[in-house]
């Protein structure tokens, strides 16, 4: 959310250069989800007319880690995933873009089912004492919290994602299992409670009208 900082000279390139210089020999991950790569019957903003659903199913571009743009995440994740030294995982709906140490191995291990759960990039982040960085954002958009949702045996639902093209030129779809990532709206409440009780596990600095926060993932 660079807009929260008013003006950053160089835009997302400046941000990424600062991160890579600071992290140096570590690993950086950013969400790079393709939020429309799902069954058009489930779209809500806006919903699809019933007579157009099958047409979209037959023609929606399937996921490509190189060409499929991120959606709804802002300019920084979109810029990050296009960099030549960044790899992107193959999950068709919830891929992660990764730079640095072990990036290929981390990307290759992301499972189709429960893509934010065990063996996912978030699992690697958790087990290696990773940190979460908020750049003008808050807990409402904290992707790392989905790791908790995915590892506490919550019920799953069947999802669809476009993954290829058949011999007739129509889009093919793949089913996978995932928890409902939108069923709870309490991430900010959880984050506020965490900061009030465990202030030793996060740091923040003000930058113009917003904050940069660094939070330890495992305690959160």
Segments the model singles out, each with a brief description of its role:
Residues 1-220:
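N-terminal and secondary-structure boundary signal
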